[in-house]
């Protein structure tokens, strides 16, 4: 028997797996319909599946809404610190910041600057959920406030693209004060008679929704986006009631007057251009031609 086992061992050939040259992200599975989509085709559609599911974009990917070559970044040097010396059971906040910055290539959540859409100049601030859940900390608030003040100074509209899980707990009350700081900057924008257009994308929760994103002149949401302050489970546990199936979706918010329109990503560029043309024709910005033809809001 021993000899038989030894002979059988010699008869087997060890086959090592062949390493594939195909990168892991060539094919992307839709979280909704589970279809596999070639990454180049997905990029051409701005990460919208054929089933209509809107996947998350990075802040840099959102900048494709702007005219090519028009974006000039501001405040890229701003980086968050660790004012509380926060340490959780899993890791220190300072370590988490360094790792997230390395992984995303961002200094913090917000990328901001000045660009144009079909020739209409605007100040823009875009959130990236990949950076600690899009949480609102000191640099987030500072960049957003500066973007609003820049728009007021230059006499151009402000466009914010918002996705967030709420205030950054690692920065404590410093994070919470950003809500008031950004809203104060927006009052100066309003005094300069410049519009704030907010785009809410999935997910948009906490302090961002509770502050500046909900007081914009025009609020646009993407289809299916989850928007709210507290999460669904927290609310249900608090009020001890079952919420509607579509609660906190963009469509629910539109039905109840919390957003002005729900716009698919493929149509967003055109809608923004029409809105900018509308404000320009009203003479609210010296940066625009007074001869522009204004569309009606109903036609957008």
UniProtKB/Swiss-Prot annotation:
Associated pathway: Lipid metabolism; malonyl-CoA biosynthesis; malonyl-CoA from acetyl-CoA: step 1/1
Localization in the cell: Cytoplasm
InterPro entries in alphabetical order: AcCoA_carboxyl_beta, Acetyl_CoA_COase_Trfase_b_su, ClpP/crotonase-like_dom_sf, COA_CT_N, Znf-ACC
GO MF annotations in UniProt: acetyl-CoA carboxylase activity; ATP binding; carboxyl- or carbamoyltransferase activity; zinc ion binding
GO biological process, one term: malonyl-CoA biosynthetic process
Reaction catalysed by this enzyme: N(6)-carboxybiotinyl-L-lysyl-[protein] + acetyl-CoA = N(6)-biotinyl-L-lysyl-[protein] + malonyl-CoA
Keyword field: ATP-binding, Cytoplasm, Fatty acid biosynthesis, Fatty acid metabolism, Lipid biosynthesis, Lipid metabolism, Metal-binding, Nucleotide-binding, Transferase, Zinc, Zinc-finger
Class in the EC hierarchy, top level: transferase
Keyword Transport: no
Main location: cytoplasm
Subunit composition and interactions: Acetyl-CoA carboxylase is a heterohexamer composed of biotin carboxyl carrier protein (AccB), biotin carboxylase (AccC) and two subunits each of ACCase subunit alpha (AccA) and ACCase subunit beta (AccD).
HAMAP family xrefs: AcetylCoA_CT_beta (MF_01395)
Family matches, as PANTHER family: ACETYL-COENZYME A CARBOXYLASE CARBOXYL TRANSFERASE SUBUNIT BETA, CHLOROPLASTIC
Name this polypeptide is given: Acetyl-coenzyme A carboxylase carboxyl transferase subunit beta 2
